[in-house]
Amino acid sequence: MAAPPRRRGTPPPRPAAPARDTTPGYRGYLHLADVGDTYTSQEAATLLQLENAVLKRRLFAEPAPPLAPTGHEEEDLAAAPRRVADHFARADAAQLGDDAPRHLVVVGVYPTLENPYGNGFVHRRVKYFQAAGVRVDVAVIDRSAEPRSYEYDGVHVLVGRGAEAAELLRTRHYESVAAHFLVRSLWEPIQDALAGHRFFAYMHGFESRRWIRTVRNHRTQGQVDDAIVDTLERQRFWREVLDHPHGPERFVFVSRWWRRAAQEDMELVFPGQRTAIVHNVIDTDLFRFVPKDPEQRFRVLWVRSAANLNYGADLAVRALERLRDTPLWDRMQVTVIGDGKHFGLFEEAFADDANVTVERRFVVQEEIAALHREHGVFLVPTRLDSQGVSRDEAMASGLVPVTNDAGAVREFVDEDCAMIADVEDVAGLADGLRRLMEDPDLFLRMSRAAAARVRAQTSPEHTVDQEMALMGLAAGPGGRGEENA
């Protein structure tokens, strides 16, 4: 029976909010209908945004509380000149002449002999700078560290709780200063000492990310609450940095996608004239292309941290399990190397599979390059990537990546050089592996295309050279990165 005609003057019926997904299991997301089932989706989204905006305006009107004292402030201030002088005495004797341009890197972590993995990608930048004739000092600000100076792979590093980095800036003129993963504990000790220096903030993701990007990593309400508070603090922090007279001359993002995403996450605009895009460098000499044998399409490599679910360890396990019952499985050789909270997923799933090697350990760059030469396919699912350095390194070596269309991935790969599944699409990952194994010509064609893509986009001449020009450390077209691109 047809519905009776609506009487003139009667308002149209309100569209109901979409029904909740009642599928059991944790998915990390709520539904607009969880606000209340008497609201439309538009009403629910509007009330959440506007009420949230009012609360944030009140919160951000209050100055941020200062960092808690370390208890060493007076000692550090008194000792900083001596520590810096001792550092210079050792570093200057080993570096280039006084006419070489000087550059200071400020970070929270830097590699040591005991921990060679701490911000290794920053160290690779430093080595390229040194090779180009730049004198580089590295200042590590760690509020829990004992001040010291050490050398790592030809780089002189000064560690302190903040006073030492400020003393470096007051004592020596640098052509440029770069901070990676800028957070309040790095910013507060040096902000006043940056006067007269060209300062650049490198935006990799962690420092300007909203809690929802990593929601799957939170398992309790307390963890979610802490993550939300942390996001609010970051949003307030970046407003302070943007407005500070000694704030960054440029905010350097590793991808165009991350420039857009960071502005959405921090709910502010990084002015176009103060931003640049410079991708993380890939060492194409170490990760050099060696033509693949067609049989290497059956040799699959996963080498990555499994510290959180954004790295997709669970997706990789499920994709491989889908191939276990196919005729391809007996021809496959899978190598899984890594560590982290979720690495046990591999150990549990493949304990009885003779063709799957699972090793819980970290590997150095040289060994990763050797592993690349032995394999043909790089399984690298993801839920969030601002670039994807491990994927690009594998591509440079000629491995074909099998990944997800998440974050900035499409900025660095396409269907000519990678198998790209939708977000969370395990079947798509398995199908990508299957297609490569069933078509040797496709595998070889994509292998060559993957290596060519990296050399045309993220090799040193397209990254480090651009970066040095941007910061006035080398000649370049206008001394600029891809700002406003």
Show where each model-derived region lies.
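Conserved acidic donor-binding segment of nucleotide-sugar-dependent glycosyltransferases
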Residues: 415, 419-426, 435-440
